[in-house]
């Protein structure tokens, strides 16, 4: 299942709620609507600075968001159909302080509309400076949810079966392209063997011995040990490991009612020249007194990795306890 170039958030040509057609546009693409009378080069520069951060932990810088801008008067149906919209409003009669709000499906089904409201241009500048990262994170999380639903009905039954056999107690829905599989002791590996951008999935477990079992050092130490044993490279003696020269980024997230420790970092092949980004979720599997780790890695030397990582990461959000 390739990442679509033009994605309809509720199905192409379908409608959702009150006859709305599905929102369109590329993942992580957004339009910013600038208020009438305030559309200036300075405001546009402020928007670019606030929303121009790179995606976290990639080997090269890639902008997290693709940002388009339009004036309020030119906010046509083409823009109204897009999946992510930031609508800036300045009105001293209606607002006394800056605020951020969201609404959904206003112009199209599956659409996220973020409102930035303030009483003055100066307040908008401050709001963008303070909340730019929060706005970007909101859009990124929305894209993960959207893409994860692409696997509600169509997913790899082979990986689901191996997850049950090798891990037990959990199910995950991953891309049907992940058809090359390998198993070990409480370990599962699936790959699409892609030529222009490759994605691999890992799942493994280790004993839960207290809160320290979910700390970064422990997760990475186990990861390195498991991958050294199970993921050999093309050259004799080579194996996958963590690139320790680049710090990992840790966050605590929740999906399907399950708290998760999220770790982002770079991987490298010891004894070879391969490398790329990874993201994993580590979970306290209380019923089985163990930690479950599910992970996606991407390999695309010299190529853009943002969309590959987004699609790969979205599949981790399909993990849930087996019935």
Where are these regions (language model features)?
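Surface-exposed amphipathic alpha-helical segments
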Residues: 125-149, 172, 178, 289-323
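Extracytoplasmic beta-rich ectodomain segments of secreted or membrane-anchored proteins
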Residues: 159-175, 179-183
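Start-of-domain marker
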Residues: 13-110
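Secretory pathway targeting signatures of secreted, lumenal, and periplasmic proteins
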Residues: 14-17, 32-37, 41, 175-238
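Long, acidic/polar, low-complexity amphipathic helices and coiled-coil-like
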Residues: 102-165
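C-terminal motif of bacterial Sec signal peptides marking the signal peptidase cleavage site
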Residues: 5-8
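Signature of long, low-cysteine stretches enriched in small and polar/charged residues
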Residues: 70-123, 228-289, 303-304
């Amino acid at each position: 299942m390739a990442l679509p170039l033009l994605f309809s958030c509720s199905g192409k040509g379908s409608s959702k709620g009150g006859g709305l057609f599905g929102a369109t546009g590329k993942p992580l693409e957004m339009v910013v609507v600038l208020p009438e009378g305030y559309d200036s080069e300075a405001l546009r520069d402020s928007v670019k600075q606030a929303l121009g951060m790179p995606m976290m932990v990639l080997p090269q810088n890639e902008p997290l968001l693709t940002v388009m801008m339009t004036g309020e008067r030119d906010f046509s149906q083409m823009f109204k159909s897009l999946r992510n919209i930031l609508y800036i409003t300045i009105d001293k009669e209606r607002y006394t302080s800056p605020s951020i709000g969201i609404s959904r499906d206003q112009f199209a089904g599956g659409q996220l509309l973020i409102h930035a409201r303030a009483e003055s241009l100066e307040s908008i500048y401050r709001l963008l400076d303070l909340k730019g990262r929060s706005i970007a994170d909101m859009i990124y999380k929305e894209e993960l949810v959207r893409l994860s639903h692409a696997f509600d009905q169509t997913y790899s039954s082979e990986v689901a079966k191996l997850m049950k056999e090798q891990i037990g107690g959990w199910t995950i829905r991953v891309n049907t392209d992940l058809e090359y599989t390998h198993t070990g002791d409480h370990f599962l590996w699936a790959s699409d063997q892609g030529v222009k951008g490759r994605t691999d999935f890992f799942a493994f477990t280790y004993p839960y011995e207290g809160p320290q079992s979910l700390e970064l050092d422990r997760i990475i130490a186990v990861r390195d040990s498991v991958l050294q044993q199970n993921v050999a490279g093309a050259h004799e003696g080579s194996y996958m490991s963590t690139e320790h020269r680049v710090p990992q980024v840790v966050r605590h997230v929740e999906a399907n009612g399950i708290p998760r420790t999220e770790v982002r970092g770079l991987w490298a092949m010891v004894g070879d020249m391969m490398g790329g980004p990874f993201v994993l979720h580590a979970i306290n599997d209380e019923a089985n007194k163990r930690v479950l780790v599910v992970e996606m890695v991407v390999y695309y030397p010299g190529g853009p990795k943002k969309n590959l990582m987004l699609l790969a990461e979205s599949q981790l959000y399909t993990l849930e306890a087996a019935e």
